[in-house]
Amino acid sequence: MSQSLAEKPKPNALEACRVWIFDLDNTLYPAECNLFAQVDQRMGDFIAKELGVPHPYARHLQKSYYRQFGTTLSGLMQVHKMAPEPFLDYVHDIDLSVLPEVPELRREIARLPGRRLIFTNGSRRHAEGVAGKLGLLDLFEDICDITACGFIPKPDRRAFEGMVARHGIASSEAVMFEDMPQNLEVPHELGMATVLVRSTYMDHPIQQKMKSWTSLPAHIHHDTDDLVRFLGGLELVGK
């Protein structure tokens, strides 16, 4: 796969960034780890048990809510008035042993100047577990999780605006790394640089459309299928 589909600014166009915001799942680790497949399965199991419906219908609801509301949890909260905590605890009770330590990625993230944040639609507990297993947790100033966002998920604009306000971020100095292209639209509108980290996990219709792209959408400034290589190519001010 090529590094980019279109003529875009060189990676060193990010050299002045001082806030580095990373999505978690399928961004900081490769989708081939199949970690999110565990979460995906447990979502269906939880819905089937809590709503008392057959598993195939539970899976249908899971995917339908994901597409309609941004996350399955948002749909369960809005349609079924379900409390979020039991869902988050259950779906994130997974085996992290499949995750490798990533010393090369650690090296590249560690050299990024300024602040580093994780911004996830998952729980803080999940993010801490994953980043810890990867050997990256101590590199990040904070984790902005779904609870911190008032259970408003990406790509909702309110989630991004809340994160920016909470952490005092100047959007013009920030860059967002994401595997979901729709989650980069608002960062672009807010004035952030955006990087699509391409994933082999394509569970959303918008991701499926990526297969037919002949050029990158305007809201995606850079794309890569190798985060270590991309970060390693940055010419960083003060480094």
Residue ranges and their predicted role:
Residues 8-22, 27-106, 125:
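N-terminal helical cap/lid subdomain that shapes the substrate entry/recognition surface
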Residues 32, 61-62, 115-116, 148, ...:
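A generic structural signal for short
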Residues 78-81, 112-116, 190-193:
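Short glycine/proline-enriched coil/turn segments at helix->beta-strand junctions
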Residues 52, 81, 121, 221-224:
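Conserved aromatic
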Residues 1-17, 110, 123-124, 128-239:
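Asp-based, Mg2+/Mn2+-dependent phosphohydrolase catalytic module
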